Amino acid sequence: PAQHHGRPYWLELLHRCALYAGVGSLVPMSMLGVPLSRSSALWRAAGLSFEEAVALHRALGHLMMGLLTFHAIGYMVAWLSESSEVLPDELTDWLRCGREHRCQHINNLAGLIAWLAGLLLWATSLRCFRRRRYDVFFIAHQLHFVFFGFGAIHWPTCICFAAPAVVFYTADLAMRLHVRVRVVATARAH
């Protein structure tokens, strides 16, 4: 069989496809964190109704998690195909990352934690679950902090792609808090 970098061709192809799926997930990730509130000026400026914005958010979430699931499972299959020691080795590289080690700033345990948090968030956002247990869906959506935090530890460069969403989310949160404080202050004044 053909070899590439000392690996069978199919294994090299799987590595590359898994890598490109991870990199490709950054595009929907960069837009996914744009806040969904009925009063969002950003969505109104884009000409989208709240319902259309929610549909876009769901589609981006499904696309991103589909790509990240292929990324995670693809690498796990590739590592298990190379040797039974590679998967545990890759997942215990937490303390060995750096210039002199082979992981080159990719922290796979953090990636696994981020992916598992993303899977839980994704599962609770499915229509059949969301409609029955909206309270759990809403609380589980706070896992986005774990997802983005450990994703940034996994591959720090992803911060560049998540930064616009974080800025929009923070600005929206600040606006909502400002409105609440103003309403409470007005209510106390009367």
Residue ranges and their predicted role:
Residues 1-190:
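FNR-like FAD-binding dehydrogenase module
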